[in-house]
Amino acid sequence: MNIVDTKINSGFWKERKELNKSVSLYAVLKSFEDTGRIKALTGDNDPVKQRPHIFWESDLAKLMEGAFFSMQQEKDEKLEKICDSIIDKIIANQEEDGYLNYFFSKHEPDNKFTNLRDRHELYCAGHLLESAVEHHKATGNSKFFDAMERYVDHIISKFGKEEGKMRGYPGHQEIELALVKAYEHTNKKKFLDLATYFIDERGTHDKPEDHYYVKEKKKLMEKEGEID
């Protein structure tokens, strides 16, 4: 059932819904401003007191997804304007090839997709994609979703069973859910195909040494000079 097909007209849950819209979303937004999560997108955060983290982007995406759910039931121009500003800051970091992760683009450009198990790149991509789907539903504006579709196309070019691609999968599952939602939203099979690949590829090797994360760790240790 779509969220716009449901209405809560009275009682406890109506009160909670109104509290979420008028208080909770803005309280979380204030926390994100204070901790530098939004400023980090443009590099204006304090690098010591507001040291960037690999999954700050996903925090913003989850906040906005909640806002977009609320906006699908009741328009909110103030909230839409705030989210629109954050979206612009996020997609301004998109690279020419479609890659979109401010942390790695700004701080570790040589480490993209080198530690899928621990570094949350695909996890962040998933939350951004989920948020973009709900943004499109709430506003009709496709700029966020268009940017995320470009990122998905980039991910498709990097991962898969085809020769030259990485046979990896996310350490923290999340993008699979987002890809299915994107497929349901657009009916574009590429989203479903990528989700299916990530799900089916996980845990397919009988020998521990054949698992992607084991091979990935070996490459990282070689890069850092821990092994020859």
Question: Model segments located where?
Answer:
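Glycan-recognition and catalytic cores of secretory/periplasmic carbohydrate-active enzymes
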Residues: 1-228
